[in-house]
Regions:
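Conserved alpha-helix/loop element of class I SAM-dependent methyltransferases that forms part
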Residues: 37-59
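Conserved SAM-binding loop
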Residues: 96-97
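Conserved SAM-binding strand-loop segment of SAM-dependent methyltransferases
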Residues: 105-117
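Conserved SAM-binding loop of SAM-dependent methyltransferases across substrates and taxa
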Residues: 69-80
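Short conserved loop adjoining the S-adenosyl-L-methionine
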Residues: 118-124
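Conserved SAM-binding motif I beta-strand of class I
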Residues: 82-88
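Conserved class I S-adenosyl-L-methionine
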Residues: 59-68
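S-adenosyl-L-methionine-dependent methyltransferase catalytic module, highlighting the catalytic core
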Residues: 131-132, 140-250
Length: 251
């Protein structure tokens, strides 16, 4: 398939994302207009992080976890030497491959079918930079996945997640009244529509609070964890504290 043929195929159907295509056009987007800015905020922060923290990206590798239709995979491919795009659903990987072909980036984007919640071999998936957008809050086992990410991430992680907009502090008794452990974050149990192609597959998910994200990332091995504040004009959920972007570096 040539880039021109792939571009024609991309333009012939609607997408979850408003891709800005190489010929200057945009794909038809299935998201409501009020929600589409979420992707622009995610992309803005990704670009700022790469400019500030990864000046040598052209010599490095990237991993896009839960790549969906490849919107951020092709963005990463414009910065990094190579990109591995991973998703559980085969149709998403096929979309990612088509988009990469349309952008003329197929030689830099490789796809992998896999479930981040199963025991995947960390050695085969190591990457300098890991992108984890819109995935954590769809998972039944987020802590296990964060430990796995810490194993495969060689340098830095950029994570975006829906979060609980509130926290709970205080002690949890541990055996008797005078023994206690401090609360270090919350997880809320939420249902998932397994039939929806943007949801998890188990029917349940644990949605973290902001403190839970911070505590977990530090506990699994990230030496530096930075919450990225929203800019004026960013997607409204970031401004209201219902969604967060986090940059974390290994020691």
């Amino acid at each position: 398939v040539t880039p021109a043929q792939a571009l024609a195929a991309v333009k012939a159907r609607p997408w979850f994302y408003a891709f800005e295509l190489p010929d200057g056009t945009r794909t038809s987007c299935t998201l409501p207009p009020a929600v589409q800015p979420i992707h622009l905020t995610r992309r803005r922060v990704l670009r700022e992080v790469l400019r500030r923290h990864m000046p040598d990206a052209a010599a490095l590798t990237a991993l896009d976890l839960g790549c969906h239709q490849g919107y951020f995979s092709v963005e990463l491919a414009q910065w990094f030497r190579s990109v591995l795009a991973m998703d559980l659903r085969m149709e998403h990987l096929q979309d990612t491959e088509l988009i990469a072909q349309a952008y003329g980036l197929a030689h830099k984007v490789r796809t992998l079918s896999g479930d981040v919640q199963t025991a995947l071999p960390a050695d085969a998936l190591r990457a300098d930079f890991v992108l984890c957008y819109g995935l954590l809050y769809h998972l039944e086992n987020p802590l296990r996945v964060l430990r796995w990410i810490a194993q495969i991430c060689q340098r830095a992680l950029l994570l975006e997640s829906q979060i609980l907009p509130y926290e709970l502090t205080g002690p949890i008794e541990d055996g008797q009244a005078h023994w206690a452990r401090p609360i270090q974050g919350l997880f809320a149990l939420a249902g998932e529509d397994a039939a929806c192609d943007t949801s998890g597959t188990s029917g349940l998910a644990l949605v973290p609070s902001l403190q839970a994200v911070r505590t977990a990332l530090q506990a699994v091995g990230f030496a530096s964890v930075t919450m990225i504040p929203p800019d004026a004009g960013d997607y409204e959920q970031f401004a209201r504290g219902h969604r967060v972007l986090v940059y974390a570096e290994k020691g």
